[in-house]
Amino acid sequence: MTQIITGTKTEFSIDPVILALLPEQGCVELQRDAAGKVHQFHTHPVDEILVIIRGALRFEWDGGERICRPGDTILLPAGTRHQSEALDEAIYAIAMLPPAIESASN
């Protein structure tokens, strides 16, 4: 059953970095990984932007590897093969940037 609960949160702010990631229409995901969590090599059909908020990630892609820390931004073009490992608890924002959707009236 759908419920709407009002008045539970009266103050809410969005970090300007997160707000800047939001496309005109879309979403930003907050991901939290426990230390040692590995996301095995994979790809995405759309561009992806990750912003490290807390902790550290070992980020690998074909041809490179880097330890990423708070404030680092990772730009992944669609189809980039990559994996990550949380070196300690890590929190990061992910924006998937799909191609523009054409209007049904076109």
Predicted segments, located by residue:
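A short, N-terminal "cap"/entry segment at the start of jelly-roll beta-barrel domains
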Residues: M1-Q31, Q40
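Structural motif
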Residues: I49, A56-R58, E65, R81, ...
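Short histidine-centered beta-strand/loop micro-motifs
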Residues: L19-A20, V38-H44, E85-A86, S105
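Ligand-binding loop in jelly-roll beta-barrel domains
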Residues: A78-S103
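Short acidic-glycine-tyrosine-enriched beta hairpin
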Residues: G63-A78
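Beta-strand residues in well-ordered beta-sheet regions across diverse protein folds
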Residues: I52-I53, E60, E85, I94
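Short, conserved beta-strand element in jelly-roll/cupin
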Residues: D33, T43-F59
